[in-house]
């Protein structure tokens, strides 16, 4: 069952908790003149996500499908969404468009974004941040809704567990525990820590969002700059050299 929660004006977190994984998966729908879905979820979740989206908009009117990088929980049901919404166009980094997305889903070629480029969907404007290997993958990027000051941060601030949809409390301790669990198991190396990681995280923090919307875990509301800098320090401690 999908849980729907409005995290900002006309911006909805659509979440399913999967007990066997101990993990929640969130998609975000921005209801606007040109509706935008951030993350599709994997193919197996498509019927649930589609039903949830249908409770908020006519799903056939979906115009944009945004995602950080090429991975099943980010864009695995892209084909299904393009069948359900004929005008739905992927929006991702230019690198993602060139190296993966247009080959995978040629029906509607992706809008490839470069760093600082903006997409307007009606009332909302999204600034694209090119963030190679943050959270992971060469083509990674993030979307900042400058209208609501919401940063859609993909796997950053990842927290395991069945947690509340929105919190003003720090999520750093949860994120640290999650990273320690990941590093101790077969999924170690989930978030690579490279030469440019800290610089990229500081550049993301400089956006000063007031809402930070992670795919896995509670959305954080408050001083987003502080939250991301705390996360950056934690990541350096756990994963850095």
Language-model regions, residue ranges each:
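Short, glycine/acidic-enriched loop or turn micro-motifs at the edges of active sites
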Residues: 42-43, 72, 158, 219
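Active-site metal-binding motif and surrounding structural segment of the metallo-beta-lactamase
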Residues: 45-91
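Metallo-beta-lactamase
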Residues: 6-9, 92-214, 218-223, 233-235, ...
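Short, flexible loop segments at the rims of nucleotide/cofactor-binding pockets, characterized by
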Residues: 13-19, 41-43, 67-69, 127-133, ...
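Conserved beta-strand hairpin/beta-sheet module of binuclear metal-dependent hydrolase folds
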Residues: 2-53, 142-153
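Short acidic, glycine/proline-enriched helix-loop-strand junctions
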Residues: 86-88, 221-241
């Amino acid at each position: 069952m999908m849980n729907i929660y409005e995290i900002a004006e006309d911006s909805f977190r659509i979440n399913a908790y999967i007990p066997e994984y101990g993990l929640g998966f969130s998609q975000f729908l921005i209801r606007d003149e040109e509706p935008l879905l951030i993350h599709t979820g994997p193919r197996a979740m498509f019927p649930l996500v589609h039903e949830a989206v249908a409770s908020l908009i006519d799903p056939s009117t979906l115009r944009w499908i945004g995602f950080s990088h090429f991975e099943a929980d980010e864009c695995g049901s892209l084909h299904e969404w393009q069948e359900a919404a004929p005008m739905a166009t992927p929006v991702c980094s230019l690198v993602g468009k060139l190296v993966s997305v247009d080959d995978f889903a040629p029906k509607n070629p992706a809008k490839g974004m470069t760093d600082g480029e903006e997409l307007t969907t009606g009332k909302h404007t999204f600034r694209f941040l090119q963030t190679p290997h943050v959270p992971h993958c060469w083509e990674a990027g993030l979307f900042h809704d400058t209208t609501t000051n919401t940063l859609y941060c993909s796997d950053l601030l990842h927290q395991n567990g069945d947690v509340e949809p929105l919190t003003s409390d720090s999520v750093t301790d949860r994120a640290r525990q999650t990273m320690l669990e990941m590093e101790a198991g077969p999924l170690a190396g989930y978030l690579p820590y490279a030469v440019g990681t800290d610089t990229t995280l500081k550049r993301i923090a400089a956006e000063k969002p007031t809402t930070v919307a992670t795919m896995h875990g509670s959305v954080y509301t408050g001083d987003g700059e502080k939250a991301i800098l705390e996360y950056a320090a934690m990541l350096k401690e756990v994963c850095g050299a």
